Amino acid sequence: DALDGAPGVHSARFAGVTGDSTTSYAANNRLLIERLGDVPGERRSARFVTELVLLYGPEAPSAIMSHPRHFEVDGLHGVAFLGVLEGWIRTEALGEKGFGYDPLFRVDGDTRSLAQYGMDEKNAISHRGKAFRALRAFLATLGEQPRGSDDLGSNNRGRQTS
């Protein structure tokens, strides 16, 4: 919050480093710590956000049309599913697991960084997991089940979600 929403949607390219992900993660984390400088802890609030969108054609089911997060664009009907993980940015990296900003992100109500969470524990609270679980629950009301639904909340590359 102290950075007015930065790095935002540009989080993977925050430091402008290209190449392997390990190098860019380290550069992004260094820049985040640098930019926050002496910002006090109470102003280091942050969040991970995922928004998934399910689109249907003009003949969308009534469950889509009546959903509180229904929208229409170019004749298509959609529903957005939001997942948010609130937390704080630490002053130094902590932990070896995860990826990206995980070593700097402390979840509300915990002293550990996300890089100290096990995969199952992290997926249970992650912004991606929350959004995918909401999507899966909605699809179940339509009588549909996505392929790979037993693995929603983790990605297909075998690493943890953030």
What feature does the model see in each segment?
Residues 1-151:
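Anionic-ligand binding patches
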Residues 161-162:
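Intrinsic disorder/low-complexity segments
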